[in-house]
Structure formats: structure tokens, C-alpha cells
């Protein structure tokens, strides 16, 4: 089956049933060490994960690690340009769950990003990025502890699909000519819009299927959270991109109010029900005024639409959601993308799960990570219906490779996500406890040490940080 790999002689496969993992007590899990500092952070990660499993389960559960190759290491073993050997793809497909360090993409043509390629090959349509603050972590924000969110990012569509043509190419010229001549409408206000002939062109596909399966996972996750955190916010720029990001919002609401009707309430529905609860004699029109402050400035036609919305909500869900019942449901709302970047800083405790498209999610997850201490402590997971890959969210930092000084927190916390995905919560909790205690005790690597006040004079090595985490399992 494999050209150059030898799977572990013991262990069992993780399988998937209806999109959920079925995990044996001795799973075989492929790992990719990663390029650059992967040589340092993977051994530290393996040490911590193994120690947590041993401590939590006393030998009843055990991971059998299976080394596979991608990036620079793959080229060394399989030959030049073999950055994604078939062996590796076969192993991940066979064993279902994998973890990896950072990967770089060789300069030149071909695959633009190894990470994006993996997501597309295995249809890992959900990127999950938790942003949680560990007390003591240096942060530029005054109150980073208030931010505790999870970004759900659609992973397979949007401009990351890579359908684009460079300026001046035959494809760009043909597409621009076709759009200008055949598809771009003339409007009374602006006349005939035109794409400049010296433009590069990219396609931004957003599908109902892709949008709703992402929002479905976000809602299912929200249902598992404490009641105060059961909220999903649809993040979009639908006010400008009316046929891509606008429908993402609409399809998200559609899913929430059909498939999850008994378990979800939209923000506007909560206002309508809440208004009636406060004043049982409230008229439909008065309620409409309250949910739309600009009601009086609207045309009669638009006012009628809002009144119809109020009436429809009260007729359809009052029995199941009224009289305060909506407070026990998962709240689904939406926010404009540029606004949410501001609000995770100014009103961070108002949000829980942010569900969004690929590009927005890329920006948003990194911005949120900065609030709680940076990408060095930012885990990530890419999850589909038949596979899941957990990964470092930072780059390869080749200048630090082999120096045993880089922060392994991102991959270690990605390992925590993997353990939680597998249902091994006790081991995951031990690692989170160990990381929290190490940071609180100022036992940290240089990137955190140099920002702490007062400054830590002797930061730990990468390997020492891993050992410090393990030492706090018994605290």
C-alpha cells in the first residue's frame, strides 16, 4: 500500500459514522513534523500529549504515532517537488485523524499552499480556531480575558478556491471582454460599469451547500456550550457583496430556522417575542416600530414587510419560543465583517461562535489570536465528514529551526483540540491545566518572556516549556 512508509505494528483505525469519529482505545494517528521549527515543536508536542494520556488513563488509552511526510521532509525522502507524496494522502485517508506542524510552499508554480491543498483534497470544510486567554499571557489588549470565542471558517470556497487569472493572460482578457460585453449591466445612475483591461481576475464562489454545512457544525458546537455561550454569529459583508456574502447570511438563518427550529432563535425573533412578553397588548405595528428604529422613514411597502415578519414570528413560534422560552435556545444573529473586527476588541464578551466564509475567517481568526497573545498560542483544526487534521496556525520560522527556542503552544493546543474531538476530554483538560499553570508561573519561551512585566530574564527552551507543562499535571 505504501511506497516508503511503515505503519505501526499495533493500533486501530479511527473511523467516521455520520460525520462523527469512532475512536478505539489504541488509535493510529499520522503526524507531519512540519518544516522549519517543526523539528523543535513536534517532539515537545508529542511529549505533552503522551504524558497527558498516560496520566489521565493509566495505560487504558494510547496513541500509536505514524510519521508521514509533507513539505521539505517529503522532498528529501521522495524526491524534488514531491511535497505531497501519495503515501501521506493515503495514510490520512485511511486513519482519518492527523496532526501537523507548520508547512511552507516552495517558491514557483504548482500548489499555492500545502495547507489549503490538504483542506481541499479531504474536503475539510470547517476550520475551527478557538481564541481563549490564559492568564499571564502578555497581550496588547487591556482585558484579553473577556475574549473567549471560536471562529468557524468555511474552508473550501471563496477566493481560496484559486480560480483566477493574472493580468494580461489570455484567460483574463477573454473573461474581462465577456463580462464587459455580455454580463455587466448598465444602470441609470452609473451608466455602464467596466472592468479595466489591465486587471487580474478572481472568482469568489459561495454556495448554499458550503454555507449551510459550516453553519450546521457551528450550531451543533454551540449546543454543547454552557447556556450563556450558546450563540452563533454569522459574519459577512452582505451589504456590499449581495449575491455571495449576503446569501451566506440568509442561508445560515434558513438552516437555523428549519433544521434547528426547535433549538434556535434568531436575534430579531428574540426581540419580537421579548417585546410581546413585556407588553402582552402590544400591537403588531408597535412591535414593528420597536425592532426597526427607522420604521417611520420606510415606505409603506417596506413597513408592510416588517409587520408581516412580526406577525409571522408570533404565529409560528410563540407557543414554542414565547414567554421566555427563547432564552433557552441557541441565539443566531449576524454582524457586518468590518464591525466585528471592532467589536471583538470593544465588546468581546458579547460573542461566542463566529461563523463566516474563508477570507473573512482567515483575517478574523488571526486578529482574535492577537488579542489573547498571538499565533504562538493559537490552535487550529480542519474538519470534514470523513477526516480531520489539526495544525499549527503560525508559519515555519526557519531562522529559529533547530535552536530549541520556539513556542510549541500552537501545536500543543491543536493537540488538545484533537483529544477533545476524539472524546478524550480528561487528557485535554490536563494539558490546558498545565499550560495555564506554566504561564501563570512565568515558565515560558522567549516570545512570551520578552513581553511580560516584569521581563522574564531566563526564558525556557521549547523542550523545557513542554516539560514545565507536564510538571503541572499534578498541581
Curated annotation (Swiss-Prot):
Q: What controls its activity?
A: Inhibited non-competitively by ADP and 2-oxoglutarate, with respect to isocitrate and in a competitive manner by NADPH.
Q: Which Gene3D superfamilies match?
A: Isopropylmalate Dehydrogenase
Q: Which cofactor does it need?
A: Mg(2+); Mn(2+)
Q: From the UniProt record, list the reaction(s) this protein catalyses.
A: D-threo-isocitrate + NADP(+) = 2-oxoglutarate + CO2 + NADPH
Biological process, per Gene Ontology: glyoxylate cycle; tricarboxylic acid cycle
Pfam families linked to this entry: Iso_dh
The listed locations are: Cytoplasm
Under which EC number(s) is this enzyme classified?
Answer: 1.1.1.42
* Top-level taxon of the source organism: Bacteria
Q: How does activity depend on pH?
A: Optimum pH is 9.0. Active over a relatively broad pH range (7.5-10.0).
How does this protein's activity vary with temperature? Answer: Activity increases with temperature up to 70 degrees Celsius, although activity declines after a few minutes at this temperature.
Q: What is its main location?
A: cytoplasm
Comment on bound cofactor: Binds 1 Mg(2+) or Mn(2+) ion per subunit. Can use Mn(2+) or Mg(2+), but the activity is twofold higher in vitro with Mn(2+).
Annotated residues that bind Mg(2+) are located at 362
Specify which residues bind D-threo-isocitrate according to the UniProt entry for this protein. 113, 115, 119, 129, 153
What does the record say about the knockout? Essential, it cannot be deleted.
Tell me which UniProt keywords the record has, alphabetically: Cytoplasm, Glyoxylate bypass, Magnesium, Manganese, Metal-binding, NADP, Oxidoreductase, Tricarboxylic acid cycle
Which factors induce or repress this protein, as stated in its UniProt record? Induced by nitrogen starvation. Expression is regulated by the transcription factor NtcA, a positive regulator of genes subjected to nitrogen control in cyanobacteria.
- Spell out the residues of the site Critical for catalysis: 160, 237
**DNA-binding is among the record's keywords:** no
Record-level GO cellular component terms: cytoplasm
Q: Give a GO molecular function annotation for the protein.
A: magnesium ion binding
Give residues annotated as binding NADP(+). 104, 394-400, 407, 446, 450
Q: What role is this protein assigned?
A: Catalyzes the oxidative decarboxylation of isocitrate to 2-oxoglutarate and carbon dioxide with the concomitant reduction of NADP(+). Is specific for NADP(+), cannot use NAD(+).
Q: Which family does it belong to?
A: Belongs to the isocitrate and isopropylmalate dehydrogenases family.
Q: Know the name of this protein?
A: Isocitrate dehydrogenase [NADP]
Which organism is this protein's natural source?
Synechocystis sp. (strain ATCC 27184 / PCC 6803 / Kazusa)
Amino acid at each position: 500500500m505504501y511506497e516508503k512508509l511503515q505503519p505501526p505494528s499495533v493500533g486501530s483505525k479511527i473511523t467516521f459514522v455520520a460525520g462523527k469519529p469512532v475512536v478505539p482505545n489504541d488509535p493510529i494517528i499520522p503526524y507531519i513534523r512540519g518544516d522549519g521549527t517543526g523539528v523543535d515543536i513536534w517532539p515537545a508536542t508529542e511529549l505533552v500529549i503522551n504524558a497527558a494520556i498516560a496520566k489521565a488513563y493509566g495505560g487504558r488509552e494510547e496513541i500509536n504515532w505514524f510519521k508521514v511526510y509533507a513539505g521539505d521532509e517529503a522532498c528529501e525522502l521522495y524526491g524534488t517537488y514531491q511535497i505531497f507524496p501519495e503515501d501521506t494522502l493515503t495514510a490520512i485517508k485511511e486513519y482519518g485523524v492527523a496532526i501537523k506542524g507548520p508547512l511552507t510552499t516552495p517558491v514557483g508554480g504548482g500548489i499555492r499552499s500545502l495547507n489549503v491543498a490538504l483542506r481541499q483534497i479531504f474536503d475539510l470544510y470547517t476550520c475551527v480556531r478557538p481564541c481563549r486567554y490564559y492568564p499571564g499571557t502578555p497581550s496588547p489588549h487591556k482585558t484579553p480575558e473577556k475574549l473567549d470565542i471560536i471562529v468557524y471558517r468555511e474552508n473550501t470556497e471563496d477566493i481560496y478556491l484559486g480560480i483566477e487569472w493574472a493580468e494580461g493572460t489570455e484567460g483574463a482578457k477573454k473573461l474581462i471582454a465577456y463580462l464587459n460585453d455580455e454580463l455587466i449591466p448598465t444602470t441609470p445612475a452609473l451608466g455602464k460599469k467596466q472592468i479595466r483591461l489591465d486587471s487580474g481576475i478572481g472568482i469568489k464562489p459561495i454556495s448554499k451547500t458550503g454555507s449551510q454545512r459550516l453553519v450546521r457544525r457551528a450550531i451543533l458546537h454551540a449546543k454543547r456550550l454552557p447556556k450563556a455561550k450558546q450563540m452563533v454569529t454569522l459574519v459577512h459583508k452582505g451589504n456590499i457583496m449581495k449575491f455571495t456574502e449576503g446569501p451566506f447570511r440568509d442561508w445560515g438563518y434558513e438552516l437555523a430556522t428549519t433544521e434547528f427550529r426547535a433549538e434556535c432563535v434568531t436575534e430579531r425573533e428574540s426581540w419580537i417575542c421579548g417585546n410581546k412578553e413585556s407588553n402582552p397588548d402590544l400591537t403588531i405595528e408597535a412591535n414593528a416600530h420597536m425592532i426597526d428604529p427607522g420604521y417611520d422613514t420606510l415606505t409603506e411597502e417596506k413597513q408592510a414587510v416588517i409587520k408581516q415578519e412580526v406577525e409571522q414570528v408570533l404565529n409560528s413560534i410563540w407557543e414554542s419560543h414565547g414567554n421566555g422560552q427563547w432564552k433557552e435556545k441557541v441565539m443566531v444573529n449576524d454582524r457586518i465583517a468590518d464591525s466585528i473586527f471592532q467589536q471583538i476588541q470593544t465588546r468581546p464578551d458579547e460573542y461566542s461562535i463566529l461563523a463566516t466564509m474563508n477570507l473573512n475567517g482567515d483575517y478574523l481568526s488571526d486578529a482574535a489570536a492577537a488579542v489573547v497573545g498571538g499565533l504562538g498560542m493559537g490552535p487550529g483544526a480542519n474538519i470534514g465528514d470523513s477526516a480531520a487534521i489539526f495544525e499549527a496556525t503560525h508559519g515555519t520560522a526557519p531562522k529559529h529551526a533547530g535552536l530549541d527556542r520556539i513556542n510549541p503552544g500552537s501545536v500543543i493546543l491543536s493537540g488538545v483540540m484533537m483529544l477533545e474531538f476524539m472524546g478524550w476530554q480528561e487528557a485535554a483538560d490536563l494539558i490546558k491545566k498545565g499550560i495555564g499553570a506554566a504561564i501563570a508561573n512565568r515558565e515560558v519561551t522567549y516570545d512570551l518572556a520578552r513581553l511580560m512585566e516584569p521581563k522574564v530574564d531566563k526564558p525556557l527552551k521549547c523542550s523545557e516549556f513542554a516539560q514545565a507543562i507536564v510538571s503541572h499535571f499534578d498541581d
